[in-house]
């Protein structure tokens, strides 16, 4: 039970720090959508809902909002609507990634470099040991800076290509 309490407390503390770092006007789903669209150029509106935890209509409203803010563009390719970030969306994502890094520093500030290294190894092990489908992996990493991981432990856990 104590282990579970520690895990929950750490998760909630990290969540609170992370949400406090969001740039003004952005929510976690906004940041997730921008992150996923940037890391999967040309993804479709249909691809997004499962990865950001919304229904199809909710994802369309999210895309509508981000488009109205000038963050993304839709391009029709036959029956598919492709998404791409505009410069303002890239700027918002860059601001989010910097804020996310600062939030990570705050969350880990009480640990020594050796303890951080140990925690990183343990988190990587925990993430890689849970088998998941590709969509679940994308969902797990929806707020990650995808270019920062040389070897992603979540990708290593994917059961399917």
Describe the predicted segments one by one.
Residues 1-25:
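N-terminal leader segment of winged-helix/HTH proteins
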Residues 16-57, 137-140:
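N-terminal helix-turn-helix DNA-binding core of bacterial DNA-binding proteins
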Residues 17-21, 99-111, 125, 129:
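Generic non-transmembrane alpha-helical segments
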Residues 64-117:
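Charged, amphipathic alpha-helical coiled-coil/dimerization segments
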Residues 117-161:
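C-terminal regulatory/oligomerization modules of transcriptional regulators
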């Amino acid at each position: 039970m104590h282990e579970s309490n520690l895990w929950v407390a750490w998760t909630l503390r990290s969540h609170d720090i992370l949400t406090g770092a969001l740039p003004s006007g952005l929510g976690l789903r906004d940041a997730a959508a921008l992150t996923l669209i940037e890391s999967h150029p040309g993804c479709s509106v249909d691809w997004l809902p499962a990865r950001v935890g919304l229904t199809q209509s909710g994802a369309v409203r999210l895309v509508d909002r981000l488009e109205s803010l000038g963050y993304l563009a839709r391009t029709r390719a036959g029956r598919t609507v492709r998404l791409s970030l505009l410069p303002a969306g890239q700027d918002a994502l860059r601001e989010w990634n910097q804020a996310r890094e600062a939030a990570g520093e705050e969350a880990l500030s009480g640990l020594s470099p050796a303890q951080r290294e140990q925690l990183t190894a343990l988190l990587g092990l925990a993430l890689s040991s849970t088998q998941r489908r590709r969509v679940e992996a994308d969902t797990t990493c929806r707020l990650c800076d995808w270019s920062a991981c040389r070897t992603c432990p979540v990708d290593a856990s994917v059961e399917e290509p």
